[in-house]
């Protein structure tokens, strides 16, 4: 049986996959699909986020071992999660069968100020330093990351619920960003 690990990005958690995780499982009924949270996010929101991508890889490997999920893995990863997936494949290639990387940028090739559009700096810095309501944060994230026409209220409502249940601290957001 193939095992697919889903990894999200900056301040996102497993629930941010929304319907995609279930659709992915439906498309691959013989596979095991695990949506994993990085430390500082989701069910692990109370933990400090590692300061390095290598630390995030170590945390993912430890969490999967704790759950009894054994390699080899296929990784489907987005943004920061794709950076984690790439490092994982580089440092433990015997554990990884393949990677699907979405919306990624790599720290060694582009510093954080190149990975984000300059016009979004002020909005993102405001979210980190003076977080507004969960609703305002998620609407801003939607506006900055989606080209879908108009807000998708159900998706944003799900994101708000996740942020309210398992808030990401400002310090963890910064630790993930730099």
Where is each model-derived feature located?
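Active-site signature of alpha/beta-hydrolase-fold catalytic machinery across serine-
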Residues: 19, 87-91
């Amino acid at each position: 049986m193939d095992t697919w690990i889903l990894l999200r990005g900056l301040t996102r958690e497993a629930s941010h996959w929304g319907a995609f995780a279930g659709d992915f499982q439906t498309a691959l009924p013989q596979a095991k699909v695990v949506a994993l949270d990085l430390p500082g996010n989701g069910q692990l929101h109370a933990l400090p986020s590692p300061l390095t991508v290598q630390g995030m890889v170590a945390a993912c490997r430890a969490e999967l071992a704790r759950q009894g999920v054994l390699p080899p893995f296929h990784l489907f990863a987005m943004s920061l999660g794709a950076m984690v997936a790439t490092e994982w494949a580089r440092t433990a290639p015997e554990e990884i069968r393949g990677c699907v990387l979405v919306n990624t940028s790599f720290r060694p090739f582009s510093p954080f100020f190149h990975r984000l559009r300059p016009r979004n700096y002020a909005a993102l810095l405001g979210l980190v330093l003076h977080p507004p309501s969960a609703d305002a944060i998620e609407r801003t994230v939607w506006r900055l990351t989606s080209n879908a026409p108009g807000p998708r209220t159900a998706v944003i409502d799900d994101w708000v619920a996740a942020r309210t249940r398992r808030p990401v601290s400002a310090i963890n957001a910064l630790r993930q960003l730099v």
